[in-house]
Amino acid sequence: MAPWKESSPTEARTNHMSVTNPSERLSDVLVEDDPRDGLWALVDSGWADEFLPELPALRLEQDPIHRHKDVLSHTIAVTSQSPARLRVLLAALFHDVGKPHTRSYEHGGVTFRHHEAVGARMARKRMPKLGYEDELTTDVARLVFLSGRFKGYTDGWSDSAVRRYARDGGALLGDLNDLVRSDCTSRNPRRVVALHSALDDLEERISELARDEARKAERPEIGGDRVIAHLEIEPGPVVGQALQFLLDLKRVEGNLGETEVLARLDVWWAERSN
């Protein structure tokens, strides 16, 4: 009888794969503190060839931006430095799967034009086959589709472009920004710092624009017509001043009800008239 031999970690993983739901197995690997070894095991064992062929297809695809890595190595690096949220981890894993299908040669270089859109369709098709639910699949596909939107920000975005980015991100905006942060595996520390700084700037602009829009959307409890009728005054600058007083009052004390608001307006008007 051959002596018993303890399985290596990779072999143990592979044996477990045969009896585990594909989505459960992949998720188990992704949420590890460092998923790199597990992801390489999925590729090297042949598991990915059977259940996730989009992943090993990246192995020979050279990334013109990250020249020291093929796209598979880059993908695993991005996934390993993503936040430990399954939605973001899956988006990182799928974010470049469209590259082999969009490769073209222009001006002496390689491009992958619209690979995000192609990758989103591929993620939407593959994830249900792995056993993932529709909602998670939709979110991951959306993140993959939007993953390249940040490119060009440092060239100068208008406020409209910033609003569009935030609007397109919607409820996934935080996940999208985390994915963008993770998608920088450069060996040049200055490049990493520059990308994170630019994304910090974008996030601050988004917050500032949201605050501005919220302020513009604010309204006092009563409108200009009610002010004119109550104070028995003509339309003019004083109406705007009264409305600003009432808006400031609402910001400080909240909604008071029309009776109390009119009483405060009377006090303001009396003090102003003296």
Language-model segments: what does each one mean?
Residues 11, 15-113:
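Acidic/His-rich, divalent-metal-binding segments that scaffold phosphate/diphosphate chemistry
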Residues 18-19, 30-33, 67-70, 114-121, ...:
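Short acidic alpha-helix initiation/capping motifs at coil-to-helix transition points
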Residues 27, 79, 124-128, 162-166, ...:
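Amphipathic alpha-helical segments within well-ordered protein domains
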Residues 76-194:
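Divalent metal-dependent catalytic cores for phosphoryl transfer on phosphate-bearing substrates
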Residues 47-49, 148, 233:
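Core structural elements
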Residues 38, 42, 78, 144, ...:
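A residue-level signal for conserved active-site and pocket-lining positions in enzyme catalytic cores
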Residues 39, 52, 137-145, 239-244:
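Short, well-structured alpha-helical segments
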Residues 1-6, 13-17, 186-274:
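Charged substrate- and nucleic-acid-binding regions of tRNA-handling and nucleotidyl-transfer enzymes
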